[in-house]
Amino acid sequence: MKKITLLLTTFFLVSACSQNEPETESVPTALVEYVWHKQGPNFNPENLKMVIGSWNTMIDEMQCSSMTGANILTPKVENDGYDLIWVMLWDSQYGRDECWDDWTENQQLNWDKTIKGIMEYDLNNVYLFKPTVGKNPNEENTSGSFVNTFYFCRYNDGYGAADLKSYQTELNNVEGFSDYWWYVTLEPLFEPEEPKPDFVWLDLWGSDADKISDQEIFSKTNLPDQVNKKFSCLPDINGVSFNATAIRR
């Protein structure tokens, strides 16, 4: 994926309306943002808990109401690019940009001191997406932890968005999946590197046990054959999986 800077420029389209035409406001779009981090020599559970608490205090003091939640993702398989990913959920691009401007001007220096030796963020690997929910969970997961898997997929020759929609419809009609499972597709708000995915798929489960159970149900349907026929996903059929902890709600 193409590297982007932390602060993205927001463009506003202003249209002229006649006095007889009512003004219409665009509906804010929810966003999700991923920031790669590497662990430092002083990284441990106690220090991570400390920096999470400090970060939440800073966000509270900023009155950053546009942030609707935050998570930390830890990869199931070691990755050279990151040791953990800090995830932020936003209710709009405008609100996100306001919070980042405030953070950069008033909080970043203190944050850098707080995390020194514990972890460091990578401003060359900050990725913003627009999520679209494909299926909501049957029940809200309030445990504070979950697992998820990302798939970066392209359409095979002769297939396209209509086939993805058809696949989603069939998947959503399968009975027996765990109550906390849900999924979204993610639209990158940056220019991905080649090969560019046609869509990014993200599955979320309440636990590893739920994931294993759901994958067993999935394997007994005709859907795996559809996936192989219609889509090619990277890095492979297993995707990229994480343990996740909610750090702000």
Residue ranges of predicted features:
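Short S/T/G/P-rich N-terminal loop/turn motif that feeds into the first structured element of a domain
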Residues: 17-249
